[in-house]
């Protein structure tokens, strides 16, 4: 019977995730994941982008209260902008909350001045991420007081769909953008593993508002997908599939793979065979210097093998405990499904 585990164990798995920040743009990062099976770059990139832009928790202002103002179609004495424009500006205030409960912030200003987000009194539980963001312009000798309620949530919640129950008279619900991720783009390029050059490389560009690091946002999105997909695994694995999981080895099972099963050039394969290197475990115990002393084995062959070893998170010069095992042929056959 065909082993079920071959459906996932035979696929190449990404072994490199690189994060690169942009010094000129705060809270923006480039994330590179490789290698991926052909087509998986688009599959994962699209899924990650959707989750990043819709499902992460963040903080936002959900309602405001201004003395003597009962609705958004009013005007505030001494304020250049009308209430609708002030609300629009308040929607652009970016927050980070350190507690799950809602908090009420205060804003007090005396003109003439430009009222900014940094003038909001937040307390210790809330942090303003864009303090220079303009809320309104206040005229000379005029005062402005405002109470702002902020909460934790996800996505974009319209004021008409707000979960604020029975707001007091004079308190105005506003649209709330909770998502800490501002933008996500991705592209897919080819990458090489050994002699195969058409594997996928996923490159993502993620920018947040500072409430969450891009690296953390990507990790949370991946965890959300993992939790959602877990339900679809509805089959029982065969005993031979479970065997690989229950047995413990003091080293990676990939070391039991024979080197003649690797996709090596003829020159590299012959060099390993002539040097009596049979298993990957035999190979990784050698240093790069040892390999370069092998007859007819040059730098090109070395780099070729290094790329293949990286696919399994292996390298030259490894210290492998208990190698070689006495029953190496039996172990190699038993663990064959875990690395094929």
Swiss-Prot record:
InterPro entries: DNA-dir_RNA_pol_insert (IPR011262), DNA-dir_RNA_pol_RpoA/D/Rpb3 (IPR011263), DNA-dir_RpoA (IPR011773), RBP11-like (IPR036603), RNAP_asu_C (IPR011260), RNApol_insert_sf (IPR036643). SUPFAM superfamilies: C-terminal domain of RNA polymerase alpha subunit, Insert subdomain of RNA polymerase alpha subunit, RBP11-like subunits of RNA polymerase. Keywords: DNA-directed RNA polymerase, Nucleotidyltransferase, Transcription, Transferase. GO terms for cellular component: cytoplasm; DNA-directed RNA polymerase complex. Residues 1-236 are annotated as: Alpha N-terminal domain (alpha-NTD). One of its GO terms (biological process) is DNA-templated transcription. The N-terminal domain is essential for RNAP assembly and basal transcription, whereas the C-terminal domain is involved in interaction with transcriptional regulators and with upstream promoter elements. Belongs to the RNA polymerase alpha chain family. Homodimer. The RNAP catalytic core consists of 2 alpha, 1 beta, 1 beta' and 1 omega subunit. When a sigma factor is associated with the core the holoenzyme is formed, which can initiate transcription. DNA-dependent RNA polymerase catalyzes the transcription of DNA into RNA using the four ribonucleoside triphosphates as substrates. This is DNA-directed RNA polymerase subunit alpha. It comes from Rickettsia akari (strain Hartford). The lineage of its organism: Bacteria, Pseudomonadati, Pseudomonadota, Alphaproteobacteria, Rickettsiales. The gene is rpoA.
